[in-house]
């Protein structure tokens, strides 16, 4: 099973927000939203939106919003 994880990470590397789901289209849409919601100032200071995959719910960060 592929699980898609969307993360917003602050300049110090801390996870600011995280949403996980099994639907690739939903994950891509979420990632686009995460990217659009970062301001130019945030991006310049090192904020990033990251989309990655894992194979198990055990690999999803504990504070993630998990969508089935």
Regions found by a protein language model. Name each.
Residues 13-29:
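A short, exposed loop/beta-hairpin motif centered on an aromatic-Gly-Thr core
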Residues 11, 24, 54-57:
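Generic structural motif
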Residues 6-8, 31, 35:
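Polar/charged side chains located within well-ordered beta-strands of beta-rich proteins
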Residues 1-17:
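Short aromatic-glycine-(Arg/Gly/Cys) micro-motifs in beta-strand/loop hairpins
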Residues 35-68:
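Short, mixed-charge low-complexity intrinsically disordered segments
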